[in-house]
Amino acid sequence: MRIGLAGIFVDDQDRAERFYTEVLGLQVKTNAAYGPGERWLTVMSPEEPDGVELVLHLTDEPARAFRRASRELGRPVFSLRTDDCQRDADRLKAKGVGFVREPARMPYGGMDAVFDDTCGNLVNLHQD
């Protein structure tokens, strides 16, 4: 077995699609109607075409409460791996991305930085 899909909740699927593709450089894998006013929207890394797809779900009220609590605790909803955390943080900052935690060595190993995805989530940038 392997993980095929993971999902996060976003306030606006159009804005999320722009952020995750134009800013982060991911690619849309699936974009299909999925219920009233919602799409089944997945993005994936162009470096791993058979890798995990990230589903960008439209937020509902229970998800809003979970996201608020996660943000208040400073907990990212997922991590993106990089081979150079500082370089990618600088690149994202140049594109206007706001960081809530600058790149720093972590006690468990590697380097992490945390940024706001503009769609209600914190995302971790991790370097081994």
Residue ranges of predicted features:
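Short, charged/polar surface micro-motifs in flexible loops or helix N-caps
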Residues: 46-51, 60-63, 85-86
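A short, acidic/glycine-rich surface segment
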Residues: 38-39, 62-67, 101
